[in-house]
A protein has these predicted regions:
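N-terminal organellar transit peptides
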Residues: 1-164, 168-172, 179-194, 199-284
Length: 284
């Protein structure tokens, strides 16, 4: 008798569960049907001419903006980052390959042309909508005057700036990396510090040496003023003969660059953007 009662109770429970499931399934079918009818009832025909024109205009503007961004990325590696959840408008600037200055680099070389970068930095300073600048660096160095000009421009911007060294920040790339308000380097990044070099004919050895010494002093002064590394330590790293086989100088990896005070922190794009957003919000 107990088994019969038990089986009966089990059967009733199963019926109730099936009933709940059937009721839930029916409710889902009803909601789906209602949504389908709503979609059918609302069509482009219900929009006024002005509403339809606004929609078409918005689509056209988005398409133009996307095409412009793609063209900027293709030509100069520059784009505006404004799709983040915090709604901040950030300019992205990439400095890659060789920094090209007063003389054109070989046609097969990847270059960053300073005549493209300087006007862009001026636009960033002038545009009230731009809230910050993120600089991505992977450069072998290049023209000293051009590199220092870019570094000075970045350092003088009023908006928050963050740099991220990817791959390499060599030679004149070091001042550009430290010119930002805050700097990052990925763990595998390298930074090479070496004495100033020059190609071509030297008329007077003494005069040329003094000129090179002044240029080198300008570089080390800028780096020491925009990082935690002292000028004395920078000169020691520049003149080190124990690291580079065919050259004088020092190669520092990500963590070593932080330890020497050149770079503020080891990190990637996530950390760099998070820091930039934090700096922007502190200024608001």
């Amino acid at each position: 008798m107990r088994d019969i009662i038990k089986d009966y109770g089990k059967l009733e429970t199963e019926k109730r569960e099936r009933g709940v499931l059937d009721e839930y399934a029916e409710m889902c079918r009803y909601q789906n049907e209602r949504q389908r009818k709503n979609n059918e009832d609302f069509s482009d025909e219900d929009l006024t001419v002005d509403e339809q024109e606004n929609i078409d205009s918005g689509k056209e503007q988005n398409l133009k903006r996307e095409n412009t961004q793609n063209e900027q990325i293709k030509e100069m590696g520059q784009v505006v980052l404004d799709s983040n959840s915090r709604k901040h408008k950030v300019e992205l600037l990439t400095i890659i390959g060789e920094v090209e200055g007063h003389e054109s680099a070989p046609s097969h070389s990847k270059t960053t042309k300073y005549e493209h970068v300087l006007p862009k930095l001026a636009i960033i300073e002038d545009d009230e909508e731009i809230e910050g600048l993120l600089i991505l660096l992977n450069t072998v160095g290049g023209d000293v005057e051009a590199g220092l000009a870019i570094a000075e421009m970045i350092a003088s911007l009023s908006v928050p700036t963050v740099s991220l060294v990817l791959g390499g920040g060599h030679s004149i790339g070091v001042p550009m990396a430290v010119s930002a308000d805050y700097s990052f380097a990925v763990p595998s990044a390298t930074m090479v510090i070496h004495p100033v070099r020059s190609n071509g004919m030297f008329i007077g050895v003494t005069q040329t040496y003094r000129n090179m010494e002044k240029i080198q002093d300008r570089i080390t002064t800028f780096i020491s003023e925009h990082s935690k590394a002292s000028q004395k330590r920078l000169e020691e790293l520049m003149l080190d003969t124990s690291q580079l086989v065919k050259d004088v100088g020092t190669m520092l990896e990500g963590k070593e660059a932080v330890k020497e005070g050149l770079i503020d922190e080891v990190g990637g794009i996530k950390e760099a953007l998070a820091k930039l957003y934090e700096m922007i919000e502190k200024e608001c």
